[in-house]
């Protein structure tokens, strides 16, 4: 689904530049969103989890994939470099707090702790799209097999205004 979102986001600028695309028309859809957050990481044997705290206090994560406000998170990637994605098409105003849970962050790696790249995107696949990048190392994570707020920390915030 993440790749389909990225491919659909290219349709408008390609058409605006006079180009053509070869994406099957059945796969072209409305994928623009008010808020989109994507993470990817540098260690293929790490399990990094994306958690989003929505303005109403609801947490969207692998065990709560769809929120009452309409936000949804992609499948939990337990192997490889990710990515994991959160998207909400019509986002209520307020802060969307990003938490990273380094469930198995591979700190034994001789190259040091892994890094996570966080893409905070407003108005994804729209002419007014804006993006902020956050690069974070995972050295703040201690232990493994954690699944509660005390063992994570907020690492970024995407604000939606109306």
Where are each of the predicted segments found?
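Intrinsic-disorder/low-complexity signal
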Residues: 13-162
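Alpha-helical protein-protein interaction scaffolds
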Residues: 1-13
């Amino acid at each position: 689904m993440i790749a389909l979102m990225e491919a659909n986001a290219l349709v408008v600028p390609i058409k605006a530049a006079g180009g053509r695309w070869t994406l099957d028309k059945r796969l072209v859809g409305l994928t623009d969103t008010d808020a989109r957050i994507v993470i990817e990481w540098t260690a293929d044997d790490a399990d990094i989890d994306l958690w989003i705290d929505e303005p109403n206090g609801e947490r969207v994560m692998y065990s709560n994939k769809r929120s009452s406000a309409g936000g949804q998170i992609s499948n939990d990637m337990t192997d490889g470099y990710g990515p994991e994605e959160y998207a909400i098409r019509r986002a209520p105003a307020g802060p969307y707090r990003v938490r990273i849970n380094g469930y198995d962050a591979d700190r034994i790696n001789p190259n040091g702790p892994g890094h996570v790249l966080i893409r905070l995107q407003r108005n994804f696949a729209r002419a007014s799209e804006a993006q902020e990048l956050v690069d974070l190392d995972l050295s703040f994570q201690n232990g493994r097999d954690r699944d509660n707020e005390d063992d994570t920390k907020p690492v970024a915030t995407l604000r939606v205004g109306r």
